[in-house]
Amino acid sequence: MRGCGNFLASPVLRKLEKGLEQIIMKHITDFHTHAFADRIYERAMQALKEGSGIEPFHNGSLAGLLESMDQAGIWRSVVLSIATKPEHADVILDWSLSIASERIIPFGSVMPTDRNAARDVRRMAAAGIKGLKIHPYYQRFYMDDPALDPFYEAVTETELVLVSHTGYDVAYPEREDLATPERTARVINRHPDLHLVAAHFGGWEDWDAVERYLLGKPVWLETSFLAEMCDRERARRMFLAHDPARLVFGSDSPWVGQKEELARLRGLDLPAELMEAVLEKNAASLLGNEAGIT
């Protein structure tokens, strides 16, 4: 067609392409990312890099995360922080409230073992935070410890989403059994209405136990590392064995590239309806589609 080349290079077509990209981006949520405040991200990332031996994919700042999201075609990210002392809860809450936006969904964090944990959970919910992050290794607790039941009950009552690290942890080579799939199963058995999202598909490098204790159970599984660390057929089988309404995409950015993790997920050749649920619908059902603070 005469003049077609000029049209393909025209500002009108570029605008149409940009609009299509925005439509695509608007639906994908990354349920597992990390970022730090501008005044501490360099120091925090250096310490974490030394502890894990992993080279990050961006600098750990909020700007770095947003740039990564743009490159990957991701519209929203859940930003997860971890309180390693009770007093960190307020600092994390204040920062979370300051960064929340249509594209950034910050979760709070409390020390589950602290005597005021249940009170802090209710305070987070009252402030409009949509969820919390806990990490049995960094916060030093067994996930199924009955002493944590008041904490889990408060999370359930406030209808917050709870993301927990599950499985082993690369920074702890001694492989303590703090967050095994079996322990996670005990938590959901005691608290069946808890909106628990088990990071790393329910058990980083403990995939046999994930299949034994968690697949098909009432727990949300976040997808990071499964497609990278398992062979393709096993990863695909595990996806298909779980409730399709309880799977959410996560990358663990900046320790994994968001674009790369999306490519690995797409490489599993999952049914289109399941992919839509994992990337879009299930996160929307947990978080809603509005901005990051309610």
Name these PLM-found stretches.
Residues W75-R76, P86-V170, E174, L178, ...:
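Active-site gating/metal-coordination segments in enzymes
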